[in-house]
Every structure is written in C-alpha cells, then in structure tokens.
C-alpha cells in the first residue's frame, strides 16, 4: 500500500433548500392562507478518525468533495429534507488546517473523534413565515443559503510514543522487527525503509506501546534534503526517541552529530525530547573497540548509552527497561 501522509482537498457543504410559496386550497379551509414550507438544511462535511487507517491514500484522487443539498420546502408547511452529512474517514493523527490561512481546525488523535470542516447552508423560509395582519396572502419566500466551501490541507503525523531515528542502515528496521510484531522490509543497503513503520511493543505488564521506525535521515534533512522533512514530522508527537547508531560505521561519533544537528535545525522542541543513545551491531566489534567507542560517546553526550545487537538480541532487555523507565517519568 502506498503511504500518503499529506493531502489537499476542496470541500463544499450542501446548499440549503429553497422555501416555497403555497396556499391552502382545500374546500374545508375557507380562509385558506399561506402554507409554503421551509427548505431543508444542507449536508455537512465531517472528518472522523479511524484507527484502521494508516494513510491518507484515499484522498490522493478524491480532491473535490461535495455534500448533499437540502430539498426545497413543500406545501402544507412541510419542510424539505435536510441534505445527508458526508462523513470522511481519516487516520488517527490527522491534523486539519485551512490551506489559505494556515489556521489549524483540529487534530484528530483518537478513534471515533469527529471534526465538522464545512457546515451546510440554512434552508430558505416558506411564505407561511410572512403571514401578517397587513398581508394575509404573502407571495414572499427565501432561497436557501450556500454551504461553506474550503480548501483544506490534511497532514498525518503518526501517533507513536517512541520514535527510532538514525542514519540509513543503522538497523532501525531490524530492531523494530525484533522488539515488536511489525515486519518492515529489511536489507543490507541504505534507504531500504521508505515509509514510517509502526509496531506495538509489549511492556512486562502486558500493555502495548507504539514504536515508530522513522526512515533513515541524512545530513540536511531538516532543510528538506531527501525526504527528511517529510519524516521528521512523524516524531513531533513522540515522548521518547531511540537514537540508533551503527557501532561498526567508519565514524560513529560524527554520525551522532549529524542527527543531533538535524533535530536542532528542525525545531519543534525535538532537542529537548528525552532520548537514549543506542549503538547497534556490537557483535561486529571486539571488547577493546567497544570500550573505546563508549569513552568517545561519553565525552560527546551525557545521555544514557546502551550497546545492543539487534541481530542476536543482546542488550535488548536493557534497552527496553530503560525505555519503560523513561516513559514512566
């Protein structure tokens, strides 16, 4: 399935139905009188969060969305039927804003949560409303109002408590596949992961925590190089970051600095987000190299440092224990 995390759509709520001019003509109503009914209200356009959806793909080809108009009024003061509301399902984590003003209309985070993005027009009034002592047979009625029409920008920001970040080929997908039920694509070349992957990791209590494997970031990501800016938005909502580093890389400390620089450049308080520094592929280094790397990392940062092997599962218990403790703070 193609992963689409942004969409621009035009929405138009239904127009209100017109009121009508009508009069009582029954022979048993000798006085007659106006009986024109009101028009029905136009249908609204509603967005609803659905936890079964993971992408905005449905809106890739659905660019112009129109709700049903209200029906015109009828005789005998019968109101026209209101237009049917149009409910559009979106993934949990979808933020909605006006395309032109940038104003955020809402943030749909929880399953079933709804947001009305375009209100239907009011129905017009029938001539029964204009009966007065001076006008016993009014010929006046009003038209229904147009429904609201907006250009909206939908943006999906994944809802995960823990984000796994790092340069390409650091082993993020392998780690995700080991600690969760997710099965991301894994291969020994950079940029294997091209979309964020979500997985549920079980705590010792049995409760689930959502982890997000963010595709590999590169230098300049915060400025839009590669797809970095597209991916960085998905860690805005996380409570904790696992910064995964390839311990066997040529310059692992420089690799750490690259990601730190991108987090700072992107902003959104990512630099202040709690995180743990994790060196992966420890099985490829001897004890002397591991100690040297740990000393260099200690000189670079005061964050918790953990060495693991996602391939052999060594160190994963220590990592998850650290994660659970940080999430409890």
Curated annotation (Swiss-Prot):
Keyword vocabulary terms for this entry: ATP-binding, Cytoplasm, GTP-binding, Hydrolase, Magnesium, Metal-binding, Nucleotide-binding
InterPro entries assigned to the protein according to its UniProt record, in alphabetical order: G_OBG, GTP-bd, GTP-bd_Obg/CgtA, GTP1-OBG_CS, GTP1_OBG_dom, GTP1_OBG_dom_sf, OBG_GTPase, P-loop_NTPase
Localization per Swiss-Prot or TrEMBL: Cytoplasm
Transmembrane domains' residue ranges: none
Cofactor dependence: Mg(2+)
SUPFAM superfamilies: Obg GTP-binding protein N-terminal domain, P-loop containing nucleoside triphosphate hydrolases
Enzyme class: hydrolase
GO biological process, one term: ribosome biogenesis
PROSITE patterns to which the protein is assigned, alphabetical: G_OBG, GTP1_OBG, OBG
Purpose: An essential GTPase which binds GTP, GDP and possibly (p)ppGpp with moderate affinity, with high nucleotide exchange rates and a fairly low GTP hydrolysis rate. Plays a role in control of the cell cycle, stress response, ribosome biogenesis and in those bacteria that undergo differentiation, in morphogenesis control.
Name used for this protein in its record: GTPase Obg
Organism for this UniProt entry: Prochlorococcus marinus (strain MIT 9211)
Classification of source organism: Bacteria, Bacillati, Cyanobacteriota, Cyanophyceae, Synechococcales
